[in-house]
Curated annotation (Swiss-Prot):
Reactions accelerated catalytically: ATP + H2O + 4 H(+)(in) = ADP + phosphate + 5 H(+)(out)
Full protein name: ATP synthase subunit alpha
Family matches, as InterPro entries: ATP_synth_asu-like_sf, ATP_synth_asu_C, ATP_synth_asu_C_sf, ATP_synth_F1_a_nt-bd_dom, ATP_synth_F1_asu, ATPase_a/bsu_AS, ATPase_F1/V1/A1_a/bsu_N, ATPase_F1/V1/A1_a/bsu_N_sf
A Gene Ontology molecular function term of the record: proton-transporting ATP synthase activity, rotational mechanism
Chain's role: Produces ATP from ADP in the presence of a proton gradient across the membrane. The alpha chain is a regulatory subunit.
Enzyme Commission no: 7.1.2.2
Source organism of this protein record: Nocardioides sp. (strain ATCC BAA-499 / JS614)
Start-end of Acidic residues biased regions: 528-538
Residues binding ATP, per UniProt: 173-180
SUPFAM superfamilies (alphabetical): C-terminal domain of alpha and beta subunits of F1 ATP synthase (SSF47917), N-terminal domain of alpha and beta subunits of F1 ATP synthase (SSF50615), P-loop containing nucleoside triphosphate hydrolases (SSF52540)
Record bears the keyword Ion transport: yes
Residue ranges, annotated region (Disordered): 526-547
PANTHER family with a match to the protein in the record: ATP SYNTHASE SUBUNIT ALPHA, MITOCHONDRIAL (PTHR48082:SF2)
């Protein structure tokens, strides 16, 4: 049996080698809090005395939370994600970071959640950088007045309530009156600009869905994909199944993605659908955090909630790159009541509103825009010269028609001027009808509105107005493409363009027939039939009474 020998020299050398190579870990200091209470997407955390407002906190299971209430002894935290695994007594750590989202061109064509994570099953998104959600809006000196048009492709909007790049235009109306359809049409109408490849014309679009049904968000994505508009659109989705915290943050996520492009000198269109649901989510969060309620139980800072969001939409000065972000917030009313708290707040923040009436929608006047109440406070300076030339007094005429419409049933007793105003108003209303997802190019819209405002449709039966417009535009594309291209390239409606259009109109009248088979060309009217004897007697009696 061998003896165990101890060699002190080897032991000493090994110890000396270990001591010389030893590197102690750097001392670390970490603030750790404890969950005192959790439920309904809210957690109250004790400890963490150095936590900042809007700081991200990490729970034990990796779920993130947002510190909103900084009380004396506790922090009120909104849980961002699934809160089922968060229990009383768990530890909470500070991250030292403010909530931010990844941004970049790779987000176009994708659907993401309010944290910027993809939810469309198409893989991860490679971001260019990150951007804070709570970011200061451009200052007064960094802005420029709105002067460039942003065409929606909707005749009733581009002619009477035009929108400029950098403008905030509210879309307001009852549920199921076509608010989302107007927003989607506006996105689809940017396709021609996108395909031009000109950065000065291209508009990147962001659609923020707040509290919508999942099926509705899927149908919007499908409509954009079918129209070829998804390639330049980002969808930020916070469906109805999401927590109130996610619905509250979703608009800021969309705004952060858009601001990245705006400060890069590009043009952005962002749609918030809809801010009523965001305000309701913020109300729920505030009540759960025990903040004092105000009017309609909303917290006192609900105006600031929307103002700091919508003020980020701007037209930047040339020194800042001349980028722009145009905002189309949507607000849902109850029984057409625009005097409620949230509608009046957003109306006062925005640069105009498009008011949709449920009775117009029910009478098949779509888009159901009430031109008497709708207004654009800054878009007029961004209107193209061609549109200005053909619209003229269109808005006033239609507002007067709406006021006189109640007397339409007494048309036989009205004077000739009033009857003519009613007839033209009916034809203009018919002309402004437009199916969903079919925006008009600016040149075709100019020609269409010229037909209505110049009286060229006065002899066309009301039921034939849209068919006349469609066939006349087809006729111009086939035989007079030069007229349309002149308007498209110059965005002007010159005298020679109008005279050429007049000649084309007269040529078209030779081939157009009404639904009853008649012609509307002067000199081709059917002869009036002779009155029957009893009708002659009746006419004479009426004249004697009037005489």
């Amino acid at each position: 049996m061998t003896e165990l020998s101890i060699r002190p020299d080897e032991i000493r050398d090994a110890l000396q080698r270990f001591v010389s190579e030893y590197q102690p870990d750097a001392a670390s200091k970490e603030e750790v809090g404890t969950v005192a209470q959790a439920g309904d997407g809210i957690a109250r955390v004790s400890g963490l005395p150095s936590a900042m407002a809007n700081e991200l906190l990490e729970f034990e299971d990796g779920t993130m939370g947002l510190a909103l209430n900084l009380d004396t002894r506790e922090i009120g935290v909104v849980i961002l994600g699934d809160f089922e695994g968060i229990e009383e007594g768990q530890t909470v750590r500070r991250t030292g970071e403010i909530l931010s989202v990844p941004v970049g061109d790779n987000f176009m064509g994708r659907v993401v959640d309010p944290l910027g994570k993809p939810i469309d099953g198409l893989g991860e998104i490679e971001a260019e950088t990150r951007r804070a959600l709570e970011l200061q809006a451009p200052t007064v000196m960094q802005r420029k007045s709105v002067h460039e048009p942003l065409a929606t492709g909707i005749k009733a909007i581009d002619s009477m309530t035009p929108i400029g790049r950098g403008q905030r235009q509210l879309i307001i109306g009852d549920r199921a009156t076509g608010k989302t359809t107007i927003a989607i049409d506006t996105i689809i109408n940017q396709k021609q600009n996108w395909e031009s490849g000109d950065p000065a014309k291209q508009v990147r679009c962001i659609y923020v869905a707040i509290g919508q049904k999942g099926s509705t968000i899927a149908s919007v994505r499908g409509a954009l994909e079918e129209a070829g508009a998804l390639e330049y659109t980002t969808i930020v989705a916070s469906p109805a199944s999401d927590s109130a915290g996610f619905k509250y943050l979703a608009p800021y996520t969309g705004s952060a993605i858009g601001q990245h492009w705006m400060y890069d000198g590009k043009h952005v269109l962002i749609i918030f659908d809809d801010l009523t649901k965001q305000a309701e989510a913020y109300r729920a969060v505030s009540l759960l955090l025990r903040r004092p309620p105000g009017r309609e139980a909303y917290p006192g800072d609900v105006f600031y909630l929307h103002s700091r969001l919508l003020e980020r939409c701007a037209k930047l000065s040339d020194d800042m790159g001349a980028g722009s972000m145009t905002g189309l917030p949507i607000i849902e009313t109850k029984a057409n009541d625009v005097s409620a708290y949230i509608p009046t707040n957003v109306i006062s923040i925005t640069d105009g509103q498009i008011f949709l009436q449920s009775d117009l929608f029910a009478s098949n006047q779509r888009p159901a825009i009430d031109v008497g109440v709708s207004v654009s406070r800054v878009g007029g300076s961004a209107m193209t010269k061609a549109m200005k030339a053909v619209t003229g007094s269109l808005k006033v005429d239609l507002a007067q028609f709406r006021a006189m419409e109640a007397f339409a049933m007494f048309a036989s007793d009205l004077d000739a001027a009033s009857r003519q105003q009613l007839d033209r108003g009916q034809r203009l209303m018919a002309l402004l009808k437009q199916p969903a997802y079919s925006p008009y190019p600016v040149e075709e819209m100019t020609v269409s509105l010229w037909l209505g405002t110049s009286g060229r449709l006065d002899k066309v039966p009301t039921e034939d107005v849209l068919r006349f417009e469609r066939e006349f535009l087809d006729f111009l594309r086939r035989s007079h493409e030069g007229i349309l291209s002149a308007i498209r390239e110059t965005l002007k409606f010159e005298d020679d363009t109008e005279s050429s259009l007049e000649d084309a109109y007269n040529s078209f009248l030779d081939q157009f027939q009404t639904s009853e088979g008649g012609s509307i060309k002067v000199g081709h009217e059917p002869e009036a039939e002779a009155l029957a004897d009893e009708d002659v007697e009746q006419e004479q009696i009426v004249r004697q009474k009037r005489g």
